[in-house]
């Protein structure tokens, strides 16, 4: 495996808190559950948008047989309730995952056995109801819910419980599911390293020197020149990754043929959602174009525990099955789609270095995207969390390094490590990308390495309903769905955040679910509104997710060179505003460049490439120090810094990119910018179309030189060097070639008879010969003619000579020699300087007109002096294409808010920036530096007719439970001074005088008692009574009191008897008082001990 491969060692499903190594993937769900610290069992239920059970519902979670119909609804709602979790999933079909021509192929040992179109009906993405901006859901609904739920800073995984009860269930119900948090995953094996196989010369080097496969030191030899990259800009555009997904035979056997397809697509659905997050800084669409399920081993594909060898085999195999009859995004005649990257999912417990199980979960070449044999990855199946492994590995193919490896992400005070983290901890967020990952992929795409992702393949499109559900079902109906036909809404203030309903027991309750979007609402500032994303907004308005917009360009940076043509750059960011609530990332140019310091360097200055190579003289290479010179041979990238070790027979790439402004090749004005060769006009302006003519005159018409061409044949061989042709000083485009493949040798001689170059038999010829102010390129091989070429101009006259050997040569020569001044035509056409740009920003134009000039003094003369046949065409180019600074754009005043008396009128005031002559973009008000013009102003009309006036609302009556507020509505004169009969005002415009309200729950009915009445007797024991009534909180009679708590209405009482004083002073006679008839009872009940009874029944009680 190439040394640029990265290995993702993620333990089980995100592996939070990983200080361990995964030694094997879970082979059964029982093994997974035993490894969890905690999990819950839930029964997901198909519901409506309010969480109410569906009265009639199509089958949910039912395993679809081949050919069977499938649920094709674009919007679904599921309730997932467990002891400590409660989710209401709002799901929308994922139309962007599958290309329109995606197929599922089943392969046996002999190859493709059969195929069919893939079914995308099970793939959904969305959010929790009422939490669109803070939650994420990606699931498959075939055979149960398989997927991820992200909410409240926690990630949950859900999947059907294998072996659960199979009893009868309604069509809207499902079987038991396992719900567990990512943080509950654990594993006993410890190993913190994420292996990266690397070579010693690359250790400690910056990431940009290690992103692509490091080239080895190569011996000198014959190389062929690679074509240069075309001109590209740093542009944010939508990319499409057409993906081949392959599941090996162990995957098919483990998950079963009937379920493996939807299982794999559920994983890829999560992968696609990860790449759509705006934190990536680019719009990347993962599209599955081909799904291959292997039922048997393939003859040329070897998959084992050894990840490196398996990946090598898979990369070659997937390249071999690519159709060569397709072009771009066209579907080949054989119906097999091409792909940009290939993903292998295996049940093997893979390991990077050995054919035994260990902790490796994924492997992919870094920077391999769009390279046929390197855009591939192997991923171990560990459940739904395999999606994070696949996204991580595809990130590597985009040139991403691990967060914290060769970059600052993850360090203290820096951007935290995220999806590309080598080690996942509790603080790692694997659902977003770090700023380092964003920089890696942006650099990769801007360097032109992702060209295969620009074509847009056909995909399946769906039409979604647009009617707000709250308009179809009002709040009372939503309550009835949840709590029965007698339920209704019972609280009205915060209906958009929580819907409160009367339960069957007549209590006002809520399940914390907001009312459906579109439900009518009312606030202190909004008389009529509707609910939208848990907020009451003016009726009819629909706040949407905010798409990102470009911010202003930064000032131009420093020039990369002080002379010879450098580069200055300016950039902008997608932050005005940043994309929010699922808004799209910006499309367009993110970095621009311009030429600077185009003046020639002083004579004798060191070559710019030589200077960069020499800086590595003090850097050890494989433990030794070398003197480095520029390597000028072929077979290397034009904009990489490839240096030759002086005195040694090898060269190597010392930097992936030269400094901006370095010429791409000798004898060219094109320069390198950000590692790619960009076109430069002969005026040394980046992107200029100005070219040299055949005389090497910038913008010339070719009239300053003439072409000299001929064939020379000497009379006899062996007579020494013979003169072939004299080339005058100033000649350009010199070319000499031996047509007979003879053993002759070429030589150059100056005017002073000095031999500048001599080719002797048997002497190897160098490739580059700096002579006469230019560079001659000498090419000679056993199977090609000897040739000598130079771009020129030469600063001295030269004579071409030939030494003929056994065979007579035939030399073809051609060059453009300057025309003597007196031979020039007196007048000729020339381009005038470019006119001033027609606009200061947002795209203007410049024109370069043609004028007739005198050749002797270059003065302009009348056009008729020049020939009309040779007139040059007028030129035009774009200029000042950068957007204009933000400014306020003011609209016309509206009509007065009132047709009578004093009112206000308004106008639109928008901060916007002109991007081009035909496009303007609205910005946030803070982007405009000038004060905002007024939006409102007063206006005056005729006297107004009478109108309705309202007084303040009364208190809610009754004081508890459902009630009403009242207010007085009067017909008033326009000046509000007189009250008029109601008939003077328009009846249709009369405001409501009552409004429903609800303060609190009313207290229950209670028993009320009166004071106790008088005792029934005047002396002794008797009874007294009181009244007991059941009354409501309003004091009205009620029957709702609890009978068991009813107070008593009667109790015993005792009246004090008057004392009897006998006359006289003698001793009192002991006798019973005649009027007391109960003395026998006093004796019977032993009351004689009491003073009263002893006195009244003295005789009876005597002696007792």
Swiss-Prot record:
Positions of the pro-segment in this chain: 26-233
Sequence ranges assigned to domain Disintegrin in this UniProt record: 460-546
Root EC class: hydrolase
PTM note: Glycosylated. Can be O-fucosylated by POFUT2 on a serine or a threonine residue found within the consensus sequence C1-X(2)-(S/T)-C2-G of the TSP type-1 repeat domains where C1 and C2 are the first and second cysteine residue of the repeat, respectively. Fucosylated repeats can then be further glycosylated by the addition of a beta-1,3-glucose residue by the glucosyltransferase, B3GALTL. Fucosylation mediates the efficient secretion of ADAMTS family members.
Transmembrane domains' residue ranges: none
S-S bridge residues: 315-376, 351-358, 370-452, 409-436, 479-501, 490-508, 496-531, 521-536, 559-596, 563-601, 574-586, 837-879, 841-884, 852-866
Any one biological process term the GO annotation gives: extracellular matrix organization
Cofactor: binding details: Binds 1 zinc ion per subunit.
Glycosylation site list: 90, 222, 740, 795, 892
Distribution of this protein across tissues and organs: Widely expressed in adult tissues.
CC cofactor: Zn(2+)
EC number: 3.4.24.-
Molecular-function annotations in GO: metal ion binding; metalloendopeptidase activity
Stretches assigned to the TSP type-1 domain: 547-602, 825-885, 888-943, 944-1003, 1004-1058
Domain notes: The spacer domain and the TSP type-1 domains are important for a tight interaction with the extracellular matrix.
N-terminal signal peptide: 1-25
Keywords recorded for this protein, A-Z: Cleavage on pair of basic residues, Disulfide bond, Extracellular matrix, Glycoprotein, Hydrolase, Metal-binding, Metalloprotease, Protease, Repeat, Secreted, Signal, Zinc
Subunit details: Interacts with FBN1; this interaction promotes microfibrils assembly.
Role, per record: Metalloprotease that participate in microfibrils assembly. Microfibrils are extracellular matrix components occurring independently or along with elastin in the formation of elastic tissues.
Region spans: Spacer: 706-818
Protein name (Swiss-Prot/TrEMBL): A disintegrin and metalloproteinase with thrombospondin motifs 10
Annotated localization: Secreted, Extracellular space, Extracellular matrix
